[in-house]
From Swiss-Prot:
The lineage of its organism: Eukaryota, Metazoa, Chordata, Craniata, Vertebrata. It comes from the Eukaryota. Residues 11-20, 76-85, 95-112 have a biased composition (Gly residues). The keyword Mitochondrion does not apply. Neural tissues and testis. Keywords: Activator, DNA-binding, Homeobox, Nucleus, Repressor, Transcription, Transcription regulation. One of its GO terms (molecular function) is DNA binding. Transcription factor that binds to the octamer motif (5'-ATTTGCAT-3'). Acts as a transcriptional activator when binding cooperatively with SOX4, SOX11, or SOX12 to gene promoters. Acts as a transcriptional repressor of myelin-specific genes. Residues 190-199 have a biased composition (Basic and acidic residues). Residues 339-398 bind DNA. This is POU domain, class 3, transcription factor 1. Its main location: nucleus.
Length: 451
């Protein structure tokens, strides 16, 4: 009876009255075992692939998401599932979200895509990674370009958005396409961290200019590997120009040594600083004041002015040495100097006459100065300057508080002051009479002044 029951057909509901085909129990068990083994084999293979990808993901770049060589193949479509794209060996794999995705499906499918399209942006990244390690990574390391709400992690996309704002959500290819040269330094640094430096030695693309350098350093400053390759030639032109301009200029030590030697030779030759400045104006057309020569010897001029004045002074020294120090040449150079008049010396008698006239009129008019100059046989300018100097001397000698009058103690004796300690006469009054008359005057004027 049991044997007969085994051959009863099984319907869809599992009852004995079903209309399904007859199946031997052993065949059914074998088919079920084969299906289970196939599912187990497929799951194990998928897990092995995941384990291999995870191992390569962490091992190749030492945990760095951009340490991997860039994937040259990216999945098509912008599905919202956000699953990782499958390689050619995973086209038959089970869907991560439940349904198998199609190659031409624009969205909705959460499974692996069946068709892969080569992205044009990968060509731009080919210059950065020319080694042979890209083939074993597969496209599974790159998330879907348009993935919006997937549950799978997307380290490449996140790293691209965090480190390089110019990169899109399209993974490393998006970074290379949208970020331009900015993705180069970060990738270069990650590749140097990898153990495949011999195979993945990148060379900067030719279109990387100053903008690329600045962009790379702004987002990946401190990346020594990138800086070692991107810095050469970045600013060599300016430094060469600066070095070329500094070749002709003397150093500060040379200027200091020349100023010291110039001062010693000038003093030995018997020239003053003013003579040197005027001689430069006479010989070369550049007139310099005594203050300028003094500041040059004291190293108080600016570096630029010191460099301009040094060749002129050096040439003047050569001209002076070539003259063999003859007195005629030295006097000629000194005579060609400033047009200053000699100092006038006034005789004692003439000076007394001027003093007496000054007491009468400290500030004479032009007509009076002319008459006085004619009478004393002096030049009109000499008389005018003498009166100016005499007035300045009077101002220095007279205190400002006294308003041009001597102190009270020098004019009046202590007994000649009034009872209150003040003067009996105003300060502008003429000198007082003798003591007896003053005493009598006090007796007669004080009562009247009190009344």
């Amino acid at each position: 009876m049991a044997t007969t029951a085994q051959y009863l057909p099984r319907g869809p509901g599992g009852g004995a009255g079903g209309t399904g085909p007859l199946m031997h129990p052993d065949a059914a068990a074998a088919a079920a075992a084969a299906a289970a083994a196939e599912r187990l084999h497929a799951g194990a293979a998928y897990r092995e692939v995941q384990k291999l990808m995870h191992h390569e993901w962490l091992g190749a770049g030492a945990g760095h998401p951009v340490g991997l060589a860039h994937p040259q193949w990216l999945p098509t479509g912008g599905g919202g599932g956000g699953d990782w794209a499958g390689g050619p060996h995973l086209e038959h794999g089970k869907a991560g979200g439940g349904s198998t995705g199609r190659a031409d499906d624009g969205g909705g499918g959460g499974g692996f895509h069946a068709r892969l399209v080569h992205q044009g942006a990968a060509h731009a990244g080919a210059a950065w990674a020319q080694g042979g390690t890209a083939h074993h990574l597969g496209p599974a390391m790159s998330p879907s370009p348009g993935a919006g709400g997937g549950h799978q992690p997307q380290p490449l996309g996140l790293y691209a958005q965090a480190a390089y704002p110019g990169g899109g959500g399209g993974g490393l290819a998006g970074m290379l396409a949208a970020g331009g040269g900015g993705a180069g330094p970060g990738l270069h640094h990650a590749l140097h961290e990898d153990g495949h430096e011999a195979q993945l030695e990148p060379s900067p693309p030719p279109h990387l200019g100053a903008h690329g350098h600045a962009h790379g350093h702004a987002h990946a400053g401190g990346l020594h590997a990138a800086a070692a390759h991107l810095h050469p030639g970045a600013g060599g032109g300016g430094s060469s120009v600066g070095e070329h301009s500094d070749e002709d200029a003397p150093s500060s030590d040379d200027l200091e040594q020349f100023a010291k030697q110039f001062k010693q030779r000038r003093i030995k030759l018997g020239f003053t600083q003013a003579d040197v400045g005027l001689a430069l104006g006479t010989l070369y057309g550049n007139v310099f004041s005594q203050t300028t020569i003094c500041r040059f010897e004291a190293l108080q001029l600016s570096f630029k002015n010191m460099c301009k004045l040094k060749p002129l002074l050096n040439k003047w020294l050569e001209e002076t040495d070539s003259s063999s120090g003859s007195p005629t040449n030295l006097d000629k150079i000194a005579a060609q100097g400033r047009k200053r008049k000699k100092r006038t010396s006034i005789e004692v008698g003439v000076k007394g006459a001027l003093e007496s006239h000054f007491l009468k009129c400290p500030k004479p008019s032009a007509h009076e100065i002319t008459g006085l100059a004619d009478s004393l046989q002096l030049e009109k300018e000499v008389v005018r300057v003498w009166f100016c100097n005499r007035r300045q001397k009077e101002k220095r000698m007279t205190p400002a508080a006294g308003a041009g009058h001597p102190p009270m103690d020098d004019v009046y004796a202590p007994g000649e002051l009034g009872p209150g300690g003040g003067s009996a006469s105003p300060p502008s009054a003429p000198p007082p009479p003798p003591p007896a008359a003053l005493h009598h005057h006090h007796h007669h004027t004080l009562p009247g002044s009190v009344q």
